[in-house]
Regions:
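Acidic, metal-coordinating catalytic segment for phosphate/diphosphate chemistry
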Residues: 11-46, 52
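Glycine-rich, flexible loop/turn motifs
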Residues: 26, 36-37, 68, 76, ...
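Nudix hydrolase/Nudix homology domain
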Residues: 4-10, 31-33, 70, 82, ...
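Conserved Nudix-box catalytic region and its N-terminal flanking loop in Nudix hydrolases
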Residues: 34-45, 55-92, 96
């Protein structure tokens, strides 16, 4: 299926996402771009890699992405494939995007909805994952333009001062992530 985004961008997408209900029970699958075009609730995950200095590994999205190009976001995020376990999906994308292999742990899930300027909407039941490591990534330039290790408290401040530099979902997810790890005294 072909989709027209913005004024001129035409893309074809065959990647499927897992459609879920509010309780994360699978109710079907749909092409990713169609799910984003119609704002259907689907399963996703967000990975946060933290080093011993309590810095988060951020990625700058590649500049040719069909939404949120060039914006900073968490270490990686994507969608589980049909039948794929969440931690396996997180590990797969972490290797594909950042060239990193570390054990991941699921912290929590929540539902959010965020719209983009190009008419697409993320409506996701997001599984938030954490991993620990300090090595610089070997980024996949098709997915990632750059990376940066940034202290968590500085991210919190910068998100307020420069929200235009970050993906819309990162602001939502980071707030929940940071409050969770502070309340649970994880770091």
């Amino acid at each position: 299926m072909w989709y027209l985004l913005g004024n001129f961008e035409l893309i074809m997408d065959k990647e499927l996402v897992v459609l879920v209900d509010q309780e994360d029970r699978q109710i079907g699958t749909m092409e990713k771009i169609e799910a984003h075009a119609t704002a259907v609730l689907h399963r996703a995950f967000s990975v946060f890699i933290i080093n011993t200095n309590q810095e988060l590994l951020l990625q700058q999205r590649a500049f040719d992405k069909y939404h949120s190009p060039g914006l900073w976001t968490n270490t990686c995020c994507s969608h589980q494939r049909d039948g794929e376990k969440t931690l396996e999906a997180g590990s797969r994308r972490l290797i594909e995007e950042m060239g990193i292999k570390v054990p991941l742990t699921e912290l929590f899930t929540f539902i959010y909805k965020a719209s983009f300027d190009n008419g697409l909407t993320e409506h996701e039941l997001d599984h938030v994952l954490i991993g620990y490591g300090g090595k610089d990534p070997k980024i996949n330039l098709e997915e990632v333009a750059a990376f940066n290790w940034m202290p968590l408290d500085e991210i919190e401040k910068d998100l307020k001062q420069n929200p235009q530099d970050y993906t819309v979902w990162f602001a939502i997810i980071f707030d929940r992530f940071y409050n969770y790890i502070k309340n649970k005294k994880i770091l």
